[in-house]
Regions:
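Generic structural signal for hydrophobic core residues of well-folded globular domains
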Residues: 64-67, 89, 93, 131, ...
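A cross-kingdom marker for long, charged
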Residues: 194-242
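Hydrophobic membrane-insertion alpha-helices, especially the h-region
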Residues: 7-23
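Positively charged n-region of N-terminal signal peptides that target proteins for export
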Residues: 1-4
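Extended amphipathic alpha-helical interaction segments
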Residues: 117-203
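N-terminal Sec/ER secretory leader and immediately downstream segment
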Residues: 20-131
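Residue-level detector of alpha-helical secondary structure
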Residues: 37-40, 50, 57, 61-68, ...
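Residues that cap or delimit alpha-helices
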Residues: 89-120, 142-146, 188, 192-193, ...
C-alpha cells in the first residue's frame, strides 16, 4: 500500500508548484529582479512561506532569479523549486486542522476533474508528467479554481502554525490504516490488476482514462469519510512522502 500511496499523493499535489511557477513566469518579463519578491507577495502561499520559512523563501527567490538570468527553461525552474515546496506542504499537512487538510485535497481533486474534462490524455499528463510530458494547467483551469487552490495552500500552511494546530498520534495512524484498507480493497476488487497502474503509470499508456478515473475514485472515497477520518488518511498518505 505504501508505494501506491506515495505515487498517488505526489502526483495530485505537484500542480500547486506548477501554478506558482506560471504566476512567476507571467511577471518575470515585466519585473526587475529586485522587485520580484514584492510581486510574488500577491500570492497567498508565498506570503506564508516568507513568514514561516524566511531562509527557504530567500533560497527559492535566489534560485528562480539565477535560473531566469541563465535563460533556463520553464521545466528546469519547476524541477528545482518543486521538491522544496512539496516537502514543506507535506510537513504542514501533519499539523494542519482537519478542515484545512480535507479542503486542500478536495481542491486538488477539483483540479484533476476539470482537466479530465479537457481530455483523458491531458489528465494523465497532469498527474504523471514524467511519463508523457506535463501540461500547463493555467491553459485549462479557470482563474477562480486556481485562485481557490492557492488560497487553500496558504490557509492550510498558516493553520498548521495556528491555535488549532494538530498533533498526529499513533492512534490516529492506526485508525487511518484501518479506514483506508476497505477503500483499497474495493478498488482492487473493481479494477483487478489494473490497480497496479497507480504505482506504475509508465505501463498505463493506452489506459489514460482508467488511470485518471482510479486516482479520482480513490480520493473521492477518502473524502467521503467523516472529516476527522478523511484528514487522518490524508496525513497518513503524505507522511510517506516526507
Amino acid at each position: 500500500m505504501n508505494k501506491t500511496w506515495i505515487r498517488i499523493v505526489v502526483v495530485t499535489l505537484l500542480a500547486a508548484v506548477v501554478a506558482f511557477w506560471v504566476y512567476f513566469d507571467k511577471q518575470r518579463q515585466h519585473t526587475p529582479e529586485q522587485q520580484l519578491d514584492t510581486t510574488l507577495n500577491a500570492m497567498p502561499a508565498w506570503q506564508v512561506i516568507k513568514e514561516q520559512e524566511p531562509v527557504l523563501h530567500q533560497r527559492i527567490l535566489d534560485q528562480m532569479a539565477a535560473l531566469q538570468k541563465a535563460g533556463e527553461p520553464e521545466q528546469k525552474i519547476i524541477d528545482t523549486i518543486q521538491p522544496q515546496i512539496l516537502h514543506l506542504q507535506m510537513s504542514r499537512l501533519q499539523n494542519a486542522p482537519d478542515a484545512n487538510v480535507v479542503n486542500y485535497m478536495t481542491i486538488n481533486m477539483e483540479q484533476t476533474a476539470a482537466i479530465q474534462k479537457v481530455s483523458d490524455d491531458a489528465c494523465f499528463r497532469f498527474l504523471y508528467p514524467a511519463v508523457k510530458g506535463g501540461v500547463n494547467p493555467m491553459r485549462m483551469l479557470d482563474k477562480d479554481l486556481m485562485t481557490r487552490r492557492m488560497q487553500a495552500d496558504a490557509d492550510m500552511m498558516r493553520a498548521a502554525y495556528g491555535k488549532n494546530r494538530h498533533t498526529v498520534t499513533p492512534e490516529e495512524r492506526e485508525a487511518a490504516v484501518t479506514d483506508v484498507r476497505p477503500i483499497m480493497k474495493t478498488l482492487a476488487d473493481k479494477y483487478g490488476e489494473d490497480i497496479q497502474l497507480l504505482q506504475m503509470p509508465e505501463k498505463a499508456l493506452g489506459k489514460e482514462k482508467l488511470s485518471c478515473d482510479m486516482v479520482q475514485e480513490m480520493w473521492a472515497k477518502v473524502l467521503a469519510l467523516p472529516e476527522q477520518k478523511a484528514a487522518g488518511v490524508i496525513r497518513l498518505a503524505v507522511s510517506e512522502v516526507e
